[in-house]
């Protein structure tokens, strides 16, 4: 998706990646508070921390999902509500499979898979460990933490580097 994507595609990304978490929290948090606490694990993406080449609506909505998770954690921690955000990079699912008849996946999938496609069973083990440790951010690929450090250390350099990668993936550089 890009700037020319229909509004309906942007709305779908927003509804699935942000509003689903809002609706779940509206329903669950009051009940958790009544019980004396609880735990939410929301799924975002490494794109929510780093962004998504070739996927403006996806990357934007995944950033918003992390922002909402942060808000939940900051607002309800004192009431016994824990929050974790799962931020996987490339996991082998139907969503990351190449389109029917295509030799390669999408631009976004190819970029994300550069650090290796993870099997769902590996993801499950990482999630169980992250929840046991009550980590806010649960990363599936350790490289993402280093990418986050690079991004926050020098945003301008990060953006220039990502633009070079984008052009290379498009075959322009």
Locations of the language-model features?
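Conserved mid-core segment of classical short-chain dehydrogenase/reductases
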Residues: 1-11, 54-57
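Active-site helix of classical SDR
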Residues: 25, 61
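Catalytic Tyr-X3-Lys helix of short-chain dehydrogenase/reductase
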Residues: 29, 64, 69-77, 82
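Residue(s) in the substrate-gating loop at a strand-loop-helix junction
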Residues: 45
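Active-site loop-to-helix junction immediately N-terminal to the catalytic Tyr of the SDR YXXXK motif
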Residues: 51-59, 71
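SDR active-site lid
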Residues: 74-142
